[in-house]
């Protein structure tokens, strides 16, 4: 194994989820069908889909979306109606780098986060 090719996120309503990832997060849409939508996320394909089986009908793992300017991204997404759980905050400091995060809910109640690594000093 050498890289992640695709990450799946379950949806309850595919139209609502497609709109969220395309319009609010502004991820480029590859294509969609009646049950799924594929997005480009910097070389990793993001699959948003209705679960094929009950065993897949659960919340997704947290996806950490890297952004350059976390406060600016937080403000932009908040203005688009994205529901954040918390505000941007430092979660770790390693040497001269601070790791900042802000967690949010997607339209399907999955938790994801913005993350940014900031050089200080």
Model segments located where?
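N-terminal beta-strand motif that seeds the catalytic metal site of vicinal oxygen chelate
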Residues: 1-15, 45, 61-63, 116-121
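Vicinal oxygen chelate
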Residues: 4-12, 37, 55-121, ...
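Amphipathic alpha-helical segments
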Residues: 15-28
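Alpha-helical segments within the soluble intracellular
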Residues: 22-23, 40, 78
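Short secondary-structure junctions
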Residues: 26-31, 84-88
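Conserved short beta-strand elements that form part of the metal-binding/catalytic scaffold
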Residues: 29-61, 111-117
């Amino acid at each position: 194994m050498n890289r992640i090719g695709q990450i799946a996120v379950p949806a309850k309503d595919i139209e609502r989820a497609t709109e969220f990832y395309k319009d609010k997060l502004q991820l480029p849409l590859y294509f969609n069908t009646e049950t799924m939508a594929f997005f480009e996320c910097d070389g990793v394909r993001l699959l948003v889909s209705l679960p094929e089986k009950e065993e897949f009908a659960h919340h997704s793992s947290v996806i950490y979306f890297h952004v350059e300017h976390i406060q600016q991204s937080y403000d932009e997404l908040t203005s688009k109606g994205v529901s954040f759980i918390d505000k941007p905050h430092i979660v770790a400091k390693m040497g001269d780098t601070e790791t900042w995060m802000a967690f949010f809910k997607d339209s399907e109640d999955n938790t994801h986060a913005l993350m940014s690594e900031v050089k200080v000093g």
